[in-house]
Amino acid sequence: ALPIWLVAEAKGLIPDGLTVDGIDYRQTAGDVRPAFGDPRALYIAARDGGVSPSDFGRVSLLLPSGSGLSDTAELINSAWQKEFSLFFSVEEVEPEEFQKRLENGSYTIALAPVQAEGGSVYTALAQFSPAGGGLTGYSDALYTTQLSASATATGSTRCSLLAACERQLLEQAVAVPLFTQQKRLLVANGIEGLVFDPFGPVLDVTYATKG
């Protein structure tokens, strides 16, 4: 058996495959990504609105060291340079410093992994609330209210409340999902009885047999 990571384009802040009260969250919530429009048009509008090249020059990409995100930062920089002739500096800091700066909002753009611990949609979204850790320093009364309501709701109602929270984060550009990583287990033919929890990760071979 061999655990591998699968990387795919993000369809939202919450990855595919997670359930809420046994309901497929993504299928029920639908696509909550906002339509921001053409990037070049947005750039021109910002430039015409008074944002100078020197303002863009002060933008930096913050990422935690040892996270494996350096290549992603290079790809982003390459795309910006090609499309807009912009090049942003990359600032790589220790994980502890990275977390501290995320929480107090001391950054312009940060490449941060967002995890759904235990496969919980609520836990993933709660990270952006003050009570759940205050990831990115985000604080909003409506977000907190809907997230709190989802904790006591059930079924499709709970999905709708969580989807509203996810939509709000994306519409306000608190977070912009780039890609998802999901762990899968490759198993040789004939192996049965393995129990694999990708969120642990835990591999239980107690009842494993080979046919």
Describe the function of each predicted region.
Residues 6-8, 18-21, 65-69, 96-97, ...:
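Solvent-exposed loop/turn segments at secondary-structure junctions
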Residues 3-48, 68-71:
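Structural transition elements
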Residues 71-75, 81, 87, 97-100, ...:
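Small-molecule-sensing regulatory modules
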Residues 19-38, 51-54, 101-105, 123-149, ...:
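Short, solvent-exposed loop/beta-turn-alpha elements that line the ligand-binding surface or hinge
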